[in-house]
Amino acid sequence: MRTIIYTSNTGSTAEYAQLLGKELNLPVHSLQQAKNKVPAGSEIIYLGWIMAGGIKGYKEAAKLYKVRAVCGVGMGQTGTQLKEVRDKNAIPQRIPLFTLQGNFDVKKLHGVYRFMMNVMVKTAGKGLANKTDRTLEEDDMLDMIINGGKRVSLQNLKAVTEWYKSIN
């Protein structure tokens, strides 16, 4: 059974999982739901949200299932931070890794995550705002920090869908 399994915090990862499931015609379950519906050892594509470089739920999913690809959803632009995310999560080189830019709304975060992001918004936002030679990626990050932003799109999944279609 091939399935998309995800862990989401504010909804971006769930939104990507649903878009990908529709595009690839695969069932989609949260990691919690999957424990009761998807047999251990099944082949999956795992999507998780990124916090400080860590993909939430990946280690648990990797213990339960045969992870065939990983998508990390965070604030960075799609396709960036691949080495850092792979290293931090100990994702084997044989497993394709994709990073996807999600939405950002600090009000949707809860508890310690909200506190941490409020601190990050103040410190990183101030640092980026004062920087005179920002890159396009830094301009985009600053815009998200200041104004929030919706970045989930089917276009961001293009590399994932191309990979999947190339192996099937």
Residue ranges and their predicted role:
Residues 1-64, 162-168:
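N-terminal beta1-alpha1-beta2 submodule of the flavodoxin-like/Rossmannoid cofactor-binding fold
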Residues 11-14, 79, 106, 154:
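Loop/helix-junction capping segments adjacent to catalytic residues or to phosphate/diphosphate-binding pockets
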Residues 22, 60, 83-87, 114, ...:
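Charged/polar, solvent-exposed surface patches and flexible loops
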Residues 32-112:
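Helix-loop-strand module that forms the ligand-binding subsite of alpha/beta enzymes
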Residues 102-128:
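Short, solvent-exposed beta-strand-terminating loops
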Residues 119-168:
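Glycine-rich phosphate/pyrophosphate-binding loop and the adjoining helix
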